[in-house]
């Protein structure tokens, strides 16, 4: 029998480690009285929304200003004394104590990277202390839904040094019977795509998220993806569809969108996206308009909301206040969930809960600067989100999440349900 005292936080340590781009990030370890330990590493984004929680960096010359030694110090000298003695089982109380200690609106005092590292490590320590896998600890007995992966196989925008304006072109293998088969389908298309790019004399180097980064236009990227799906032996729109992350805030200036040689106002931008949906089997569009273009977003939702999943990333930044504003204005129909946008596990779960209660889907997501940490894989199953975005089929920091989902599916056995097989993947008319 587990003694509740064994689950009390005893020690918290932190260190500066590296992410997949070679930039420093924060790792925390939470040790409990009974000897259980949880470790977590926070990710970092390249295309960050203006409304995200504050990621604390040191500045100065060290690591070209990107060091996180200050965040590490905050954990060991401020957060640890506050949390030691609390039960790791009370995640809400642990996170609330850190938010109170920080005292700012955007976690700029302690740093969202410091708070999140401890928040995630606490959950893992509690799970380990109880002898439970993380997805079961966070999700309870109903945590059995494996997500449809949105696989970013062509990278552009802020994630790659190429001519593509849109940031991500993704495969969505919703027609698979299981997660394992979905992963196989996506992998086969990924390798087929590489062959097609090679045959056309295009680059097969990869971007931050493991996808290819050829010099293509947005329409050309869609065309070669459909070609790859077909050549791999699958039916576009029936077995594998497409998803886009437009990341339009990155090319929005003075009220206009400049991409592919054109310059568009909000209504014209919506028209451009409508044309793409008509041309390709697209089931999901993320950040189709800029983060503060609320009127444009409303128009986009009116025109395409009944056909495809419209995901707010920079628009909502995993923030319940921003999400509620979107719900009140009938804006978008889905939220991208990035734990480091809001900076604590409790607030992340609150955003997912609000989305679900309001008829919005949730897509659990990585960041472009990732690590070997697999928390988001467990989180996607724990919350029954039904969708995960964790990059392409290369680079071990991406594949780590897919491999963890394979383990979870095996562990669940006959209880495992693949979201695509029960119609719980992205919305769409494909």
Swiss-Prot record:
Mg(2+) binds at residues 245, 286, 313. Pathway: Carbohydrate degradation; glycolysis; pyruvate from D-glyceraldehyde 3-phosphate: step 4/5. The keyword Secreted applies. PROSITE patterns: ENOLASE. It is found in: Cytoplasm; Secreted; Cell surface. One of its GO terms (molecular function) is magnesium ion binding. Binds a second Mg(2+) ion via substrate during catalysis. It comes from the Bacteria. (2R)-2-phosphoglycerate binds at residues 167, 338, 367-368, 389. The keyword Cell membrane does not apply. SMART domains: Enolase_C, Enolase_N. InterPro entries: Enolase, Enolase-like_C_sf, Enolase-like_N, Enolase_C, Enolase_CS, Enolase_N. Its EC number is 4.2.1.11. It catalyses: (2R)-2-phosphoglycerate = phosphoenolpyruvate + H2O. One of its GO terms (cellular component) is phosphopyruvate hydratase complex. The active site is at residues 209, 338. Its cofactor is Mg(2+). GO terms for biological process: glycolytic process. It is an enzyme of class 4 (lyase). Catalyzes the reversible conversion of 2-phosphoglycerate (2-PG) into phosphoenolpyruvate (PEP). It is essential for the degradation of carbohydrates via glycolysis. This is Enolase. It comes from Parasynechococcus marenigrum (strain WH8102).
């Amino acid at each position: 029998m587990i003694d509740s005292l064994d689950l009390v936080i005893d020690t918290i340590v932190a260190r500066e480690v590296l992410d997949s781009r070679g930039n420093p990030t924060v790792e925390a370890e939470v040790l409990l009285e009974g000897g259980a330990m949880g470790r977590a590493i926070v990710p970092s984004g390249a295309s960050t929304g203006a409304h995200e929680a504050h990621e604390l960096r040191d500045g100065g010359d060290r690591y070209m200003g990107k060091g996180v030694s200050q965040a590490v110090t905050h954990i060991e000298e401020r957060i640890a004394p506050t949390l030691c003695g609390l039960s790791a089982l009370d995640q809400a109380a642990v996170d609330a104590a850190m938010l109170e200690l920080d005292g700012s609106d955007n976690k700029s005092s302690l740093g969202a990277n410091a708070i999140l590292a401890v928040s995630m490590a606490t959950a893992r320590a509690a799970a380990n202390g109880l002898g439970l896998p993380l997805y079961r600890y966070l999700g309870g007995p109903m945590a059995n839904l494996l997500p449809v992966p949105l696989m970013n196989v062509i990278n552009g925008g802020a994630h790659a040094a190429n001519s593509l304006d849109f940031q991500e072109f993704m495969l969505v293998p919703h027609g698979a019977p299981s997660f394992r088969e979905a992963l196989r389908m996506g992998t086969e298309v990924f390798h087929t795509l590489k062959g097609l790019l090679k045959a056309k004399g295009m680059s097969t180097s990869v971007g931050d998220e493991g996808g290819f980064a050829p010099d293509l236009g947005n329409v050309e990227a869609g065309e070669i993806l459909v070609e790859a799906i077909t050549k791999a032996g699958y039916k576009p729109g029936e077995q594998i569809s497409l998803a886009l992350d437009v990341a339009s805030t990155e090319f929005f200036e003075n009220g206009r969108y400049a991409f592919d040689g054109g310059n568009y106002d909000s209504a014209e931008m919506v028209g451009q996206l409508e044309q793409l949906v008509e041309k390709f089997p697209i089931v999901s569009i993320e950040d189709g308009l800029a983060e503060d273009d609320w009127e444009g977003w409303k128009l986009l939702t009116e025109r395409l909301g009944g056909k495809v999943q419209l995901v707010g990333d920079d628009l909502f930044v995993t923030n319940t206040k921003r999400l509620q504003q979107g719900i009140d204005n009938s804006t978008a129909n889905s939220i991208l969930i990035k734990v480091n946008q809001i900076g604590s596990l409790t607030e992340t779960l609150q955003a997912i809960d609000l989305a679900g209660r309001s008829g919005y889907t949730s897509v659990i997501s990585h960041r472009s600067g990732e690590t070997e940490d697999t928390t988001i894989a467990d989180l996607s199953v724990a919350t029954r989100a039904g969708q995960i975005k964790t990059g392409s089929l290369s680079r071990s920091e991406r594949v780590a999440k897919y491999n963890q989902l394979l383990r979870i599916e095996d562990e669940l056995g006959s209880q495992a349900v693949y979201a695509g097989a029960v119609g719980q993947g992205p919305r769409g008319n494909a």
